Amino acid sequence: MLPFVLVLLVATSALAAPSVVISQDNINNIAPRVGNGRPISSALIDRAFEIVDGGDTNIYILTIQQILNDLADQPDGLSQSLAVTQAVAALGELATGVPGNSCEAAAVIDAYANSVRTGDNSALSIAVANYINRLSSNIGLISQLASNPDSLRYSSGPAGNCAGGGRSYQFEAAWDAVLNNANPYQIGLINEEYCAARRLYNAFNSRSNNVGAAITAGAVVAQTQAAQIILPSLVNVLSAVAAGGNVAGAAAQAGQALANAAANVQL
């Protein structure tokens, strides 16, 4: 049974340093989220994240998870697409015992920032295609994790060949553009997401860096036409994970759909 830990910060006065009280309870005592009748909801995102081990999940990753829950419950399609795309991206980074790198994420972030500045989308199309392939790899990892939680404990995440393992990219420029394009339903949540992702980007450990890059890249890709094409397949995978269904079958179908989308990216 998984523990649920509540951290309570208490300050006895305005000038006093806060004290910390930790209460541990069984997660089974916490009421699960209830679906809202739509295919995409906070219940879907929340249950999908239950497959990953919480040992490497720091407070900023938990913050991201709650933001994704809130985005999934928004009434607009872009917020829901963002929640699903970023959930798959983050779950892939949390699936393996040893972090990989974020070369594809860094490439799509840099290409997006450059395209906003220059108006040239040619490099962005290639980068989006490569990142969709990375999402396909993430789906494979999610499928393995759902089938056997111990199967990836000693495995490493995807490796690539890029400077610094994809830990350095145009973070601020990309998020400036993402925030400028946010709609009224999501602007507050996107700003919260930016703040949490920034802490992950500046963290010393590669797991946090990878999740920060995944969330940032997901925010970029979710705005493209390709995201709408792959969205149903991503939802099917998360639904199978959440329901304890045939994740392998959903992952196989999603892999084909993502391969087709990657081969036909249009911006």
From Swiss-Prot:
Changes after translation: Partially N-terminally processed to yield a short form which lacks the first two residues of the long form.
GO cellular component, one term: extracellular region
Keyword Nucleotidyltransferase tagged: no
Main location: secreted
InterPro entries: L-fibroin
Keywords annotated in UniProt: Acetylation, Disulfide bond, Secreted, Signal, Silk protein
Pfam families (alphabetical): L-fibroin
Tissues where this protein is expressed: Produced exclusively in the posterior (PSG) section of silk glands, which are essentially modified salivary glands.
Subcellular location per the Swiss-Prot or TrEMBL entry: Secreted
Keyword Signal tagged: yes
Disulfide bond sites: 103-162
Modified residues (N-acetylserine): 19
Region forming the signal peptide: 1-16
Function field: It is likely that the major role of L-chain is to prevent the retention of H-chain in ER by forming the disulfide linkage.
Subunit structure: Silk fibroin elementary unit consists in a disulfide-linked heavy and light chain and a p25 glycoprotein in molar ratios of 6:6:1. This results in a complex of approximately 2.3 MDa.
Protein name: Fibroin light chain
Species name: Galleria mellonella
